[in-house]
Amino acid sequence: MSCCDLAAAGQLGKAGIMASDCEPALNQAESRNPTLERYLGALREAKNDSEQFAALLLVTKAVKAGDIDAKTRRRIFDAVGFTFPNRLLTTKEAPDGCPDHVLRALGVALLACFCSDPELASHPQVLNKIPILSTFLTARGDPDDAARRSMIDDTYQCLTAVAGTPRGPRHLIAGGTVSALCQAYLGHGYGFDQALALLVGLLAAAETQCWKEAEPDLLAVLRGLSEDFQRAEDASKFELCQLLPLFLPPTTVPPECHRDLQAGLARILGSKLSSWQRNPALKLAARLAHACGSDWIPVGSSGSKFLALLVNLACVEVRLALEETGTEVKEDVVTACYALMELGIQECTRCEQSLLKEPQKVQLVSIMKEAIGAVIHYLLQVGPEKQKEPFVFASVRILGAWLAEETSSLRKEVCQLLPFLVRYAKTLYEEAEEASDISQQVANLAISPTTPGPSWPGDALRLLLPGWCHLTVEDGPREILIKEGAPSLLCKYFLQQWELTSPGHDTSVLPDSVEIGLQTCCHIFLNLVVTAPGLIKRDACFTSLMNTLMTSLPSLVQQQGRLLLAANVATLGLLMARLLSTSPALQGTPASRGFFAAAILFLSQSHVARATPGSDQAVLALSPDYEGIWADLQELWFLGMQAFTGCVPLLPWLAPAALRSRWPQELLQLLGSVSPNSVKPEMVAAYQGVLVELARANRLCREAMRLQAGEETASHYRMAALEQCLSEP
């Protein structure tokens, strides 16, 4: 058979390809075409390759392009099977005068015909051809060769059909298709636009797996698209705005892409545009904000103006969408604007290396305040039936970000919304699995309807904790939160989150957000201890909380790198113990003794004696573990010392326990070994407070302090109260 006959037989694949677009059903008369039936019979009875070629050519002539339906294609497959196209794809012996790629082209054409049947597209015999098909996309050859072009078209037809099956994307990724598509696109050869379209589909279906298998190649495509975006002067820049979010990696965007992406966005957003042109640009900017923060925006005047423009546009879009009652909200666009507003909040509150100058910050805060007012207005309209909608979650998120930094403005509106926020947080807390699903849906909204973005926190309460921490200091908001049951909800939430830190969980992979959430809960409880002590005494949830603090602190203080959380737990527990001192759980039980021993460990290990060059006397210095975080720790430490001092007269067993720990003796020994000039007055006051109460509470403590030169040390440090106490019998 001649090479021309082979090419003609290949037109069967073309019939199948065109049929995949048209799919007209054969009527009963056509389905019984006697000529076609005879040729199919010949195809089934063919005894060698030459006879199969001839029969295929006859079938091609009997079936007009576009007149083949799924049933007929299946009958052709039943007659041909996979063995023949398999040989065509792998053979290295072509007829004289016929390029070997013509045989492969015919094999691919047959596969393309078969793959238009979804059942055949997922057949193992098709799936195991993925690596071979992928190599065809990047094979070198004459770009004007019709057979080669036909083979490339058929290859994309096969791969696209496989991608449309349920498990197809996974097989394509495993077969090296993503890298091949990237190389085909970057080569800009024939069919490169089809490569990009298929890449988009695979990234939409399995982003994480694509990046895991082909990160270098995908980054190369991103660099190419970014350069095209920066150079584009025509409508293609808007198309690239739609594509680029799909090609941003799940971790971080390469710095070499930052300039091109920012320049392209600046040119688009700085022009007068319709919404369909502007909205994709806002979404792309939001995705970049998620991935890079503000790192992708250049430092200097142009960068600050661009950031101000972004936040301005986002705030205007939010107000237009949420202030007009009855208008349809473009939730994906508004959610993207929320991300840009959050970027604005971060930059406005950044003290060092902020992109914004002070006048710009003042202006943006005013603009964002109006947009947050629109968000509050929207949330006040939300009924119970909408509380599980992702857009509501996104709206609560941006409000939480605002309240974390600013609670003095919009105070009346915030107080009006607080009952809703407590109910909303409680609803999602009680349905944690659905809340996690909502979180992912919100991430999808921020980017596009098809592409998942960075995960957002899975519970609304964590978003609101920083704002509630500020609000519990103020009388009005605190009363509303207490009335709506927020303290009880916070206790339950704290206990649930604490379970994640228990020995049964791998705390080495504990998300930072969990520990930060626990610390913020502690701060809220500290506010309530100080401002609403009666609540702590009467609400049973705080008794449960106290029990958890007592049983947890002993192991927590031993864990490396968790000193700040231990400080929060210790200080909160000490302050609550002072209020709950009559509770049976605090009457010298093993749990209470373990807690106070751990609290003493935290308080006693903060400072050490450190030798100084050229001096015979050491100085009081922070211990290495405390030194790096003392700025965050010192307020808790001083508060903890004060709370421990207050517990000593209320718990008779505590002074003997402290004596057995040797804390008072070691404290006096430390003070005696350092220069008094190196001990700050506030440290002297804190140490004296503890030593005086221990001495007053227990005779054995007084005797032990005297033996440790307590009176002499008290005199050196001008601790009059301690000196007087130790001088008494």
Curated annotation (Swiss-Prot):
Is the keyword Cytoplasm in the record?
yes
Q: What SUPFAM superfamilies does this protein's entry cite?
A: ARM repeat
Q: Which residues carry this modification: Phosphoserine?
A: 2, 448
Modification sites for Asymmetric dimethylarginine: 75
Question: Would the keyword Plastid be found if you checked this record's keyword annotation?
Answer: no
Q: Where this protein primarily resides, as one coarse class?
A: cytoplasm
| Lipid-modified sites (S-palmitoyl cysteine) | 3-4
Q: State which tissues express it.
A: Expressed in the neuronal, chondral and bone tissues. Expressed in dendrites. Enriched in the brain in the surface layer I-IV. In brains, protein level increases in male but decreases in female with advancing age (at protein level). In adult brains, it is highly expressed in the forebrain and hindbrain. Highly expressed in the hippocampus, piriform cortex, septum, amygdaloid complex, medial geniculate nucleus, inferior colliculus, cerebellar nuclei and the nuclei of the Vth, VIIth, and XIIth cranial nerves. In bone tissues, it is expressed in osteoblasts and osteocytes.
Q: Name one Pfam family in it.
A: Neurochondrin
Q: Name one GO cellular component term.
A: postsynapse
Q: What happens when the gene is disrupted?
A: Death between 3.5 and 6.5 dpc. Heterozygous mutant do not display gross anatomic abnormalities. They however show abnormalities in developing cartilage. Nervous system-specific gene disruption by conditional knockout results in epileptic seizure. Displays no overt neurite outgrowth phenotype. Shows a behavioral phenotype associated with a rodent model of schizophrenia, as observed in alterations in both sensorimotor gating and psychotomimetic-induced locomotor activity.
Q: How is it modified after translation?
A: Palmitoylated. Palmitoylation by ZDHHC1, ZDHHC3 and ZDHHC11 regulates the association of NCDN with endosome membranes. May also be palmitoylated by ZDHHC7.
Give the domain of life.
Eukaryota
Keywords linked to the UniProt accession: Acetylation, Cell projection, Cytoplasm, Endosome, Lipoprotein, Membrane, Methylation, Palmitate, Phosphoprotein, Synapse
Membrane-crossing ranges are: none
Q: How is this protein positioned relative to the membrane?
A: Lipid-anchor
> What is the protein's quaternary organization?
Interacts with MCHR1. Interacts with SEMA4C. Interacts with DIAPH1 (via FH3 domain). Interacts with GRM5.
What is the recorded function of this protein according to its Swiss-Prot or TrEMBL entry?
Probably involved in signal transduction, in the nervous system, via increasing cell surface localization of GRM5 and positively regulating its signaling. Required for the spatial learning process. Acts as a negative regulator of Ca(2+)-calmodulin-dependent protein kinase 2 (CaMK2) phosphorylation. May play a role in modulating melanin-concentrating hormone-mediated functions via its interaction with MCHR1 that interferes with G protein-coupled signal transduction. May be involved in bone metabolism. May also be involved in neurite outgrowth.
Q: What is this protein called?
A: Neurochondrin
Native source species: Mus musculus (Mouse)
